[in-house]
């Protein structure tokens, strides 16, 4: 089958031919329709320090996808040939304390699809049936293919009650931008997002941001004054991994505020702990998606009117993957979709 793989320990990916995956007793085989390019895939493309330490070579990658079940293992129940599915990209052990307690997103033995094992940038993907998630017919293939990052945004944004709250999001990548739409959808009052990328900030405005702030030119304090905010933000969502962004977020938080961290900062990042202690801030680290509560919430929000369509800005045939990666690398894109049916 056709697949997009890391064949050598260096930058780039190669469209190649690999063996179609075997289907275990508890697996489903998915014929891929669409995939989306993730920030993780950009790290793999660039072959940065993280990728060099993490990605086995050779291996085909990718973990954001939608497709159709074409084969099932003999032990699989609850699915049928022809079901349209996306899937949870974190394959968990099922035996550790967190797995047995229903907190599988905190499994200490997680294996990542397209990171630690063969991925979805291919014509077929085999995964445990437990990880597959049926997609309702009213949700498009394009939207279903981005359920993985949509899930990151959902898990982060819905970690705290947002109804009537003022929310600050630092980092206008696709996940941060989707968090804007989620926060507005569930009833936040002001949703402010910060970045230095004007293209992405404009996308955030289209997705409903009260203010999209280029902090290279505009003061967050001035924006808060314009919005008649006198006590700071109630909820902060750190999506960038940039230390200066986290610092500004802590400074802008109200006393008793709540902060969710999804962005991954450099190791040993220093912060002003006085901001945390004397403001009584609650800080929560976010990893992946809650299995499968996050997935049900994603579907429910889309079915109740959440519009994520502006975040998908580019579409290419899988054979034109280099154009897709170029769009992502340019910084002037939202989500980029690769079509495996053409």
From Swiss-Prot:
Cofactor: Zn(2+)
Details of cofactor binding: Binds 2 Zn(2+) ions per subunit.
SMART domains: PKS_ER (SM00829)
Top-level taxon in the UniProt lineage: Bacteria
UniProt: NAD(+) binding residues: 175, 195, 200, 262-264, 286-287
Any one GO cellular component localisation term in the record: cytoplasm
The EC number(s) this enzyme carries: 1.1.1.103
Catalytic activity: L-threonine + NAD(+) = (2S)-2-amino-3-oxobutanoate + NADH + H(+)
Residues of the site described as Important for catalytic activity for the proton relay mechanism but does not participate directly in the coordination of zinc atom: 148
Location of this chain's protein in the cell: Cytoplasm
A family per Pfam: ADH_zinc_N
One record GO biological process: L-threonine catabolic process to glycine
Binding site for Zn(2+) 2: 93, 96, 99, 107
Active site residues of this protein: 40 (charge relay system), 43 (charge relay system)
Principal EC category: oxidoreductase
Recorded GO MF terms: L-threonine 3-dehydrogenase activity; zinc ion binding
Residues that coordinate or bind Zn(2+) 1: 38, 63-64
Cited SUPFAM superfamilies: GroES-like, NAD(P)-binding Rossmann-fold domains
Record keywords: Cytoplasm, Metal-binding, NAD, Oxidoreductase, Zinc
HAMAP family linked to this entry: Thr_dehydrog
Function: Catalyzes the NAD(+)-dependent oxidation of L-threonine to 2-amino-3-ketobutyrate.
Family named by the database record: Belongs to the zinc-containing alcohol dehydrogenase family.
Subunit structure and binding partners: Homotetramer.
Protein name per UniProt: L-threonine 3-dehydrogenase
Organism the protein comes from: Burkholderia cenocepacia (strain ATCC BAA-245 / DSM 16553 / LMG 16656 / NCTC 13227 / J2315 / CF5610)
């Amino acid at each position: 089958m056709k697949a997009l793989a890391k064949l050598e320990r260096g930058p780039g990916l190669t469209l190649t031919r690999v063996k179609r995956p075997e289907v275990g007793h508890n697996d489903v085989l998915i014929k891929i329709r669409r995939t989306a390019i993730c920030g993780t895939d950009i790290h793999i493309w660039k072959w940065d320090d993280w990728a060099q330490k993490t990605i086995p070579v050779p291996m085909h990658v990718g973990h954001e996808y939608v497709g159709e079940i074409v084969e099932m293992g003999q032990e699989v129940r609850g699915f049928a040939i022809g079901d349209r599915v996306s899937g949870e990209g974190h394959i968990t052990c099922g035996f550790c304390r967190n797995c047995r307690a229903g907190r599988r997103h905190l499994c200490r033995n997680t294996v990542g699809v397209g990171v630690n094992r063969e991925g979805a940038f291919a014509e077929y993907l085999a995964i445990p049936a437990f990880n597959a998630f049926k997609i309702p017919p009213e949700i498009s293939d394009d939207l279903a293919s981005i359920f993985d990052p949509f899930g990151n945004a959902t898990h982060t944004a819905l970690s705290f009650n947002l109804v009537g709250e003022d929310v600050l999001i630092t980092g206008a990548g696709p996940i941060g931008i989707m968090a804007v739409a989620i926060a507005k959808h569930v009833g936040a009052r002001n949703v402010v997002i910060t970045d230095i990328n004007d293209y992405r900030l404009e996308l955030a405005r289209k997705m409903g941001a009260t203010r999209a702030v280029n902090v290279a030119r505009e003061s967050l304090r001035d924006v808060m004054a314009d919005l008649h905010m006198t006590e700071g933000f109630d909820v902060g969502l750190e999506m960038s991994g940039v230390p200066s962004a986290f610092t500004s977020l802590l400074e802008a938080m109200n006393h008793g505020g709540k902060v969710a961290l999804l962005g991954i900062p450099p190791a040993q990042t220093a912060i002003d702990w006085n901001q945390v202690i004397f403001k009584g801030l609650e800080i929560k680290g976010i990893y992946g998606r809650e299995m499968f509560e996050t997935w049900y919430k994603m579907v429910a929000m889309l079915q109740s009117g959440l519009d994520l369509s502006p975040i998908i800005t580019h579409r290419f045939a899988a054979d034109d993957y280099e154009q897709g990666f170029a769009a992502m690398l340019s910084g002037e894109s939202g989500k980029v979709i690769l079509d495996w049916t053409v």
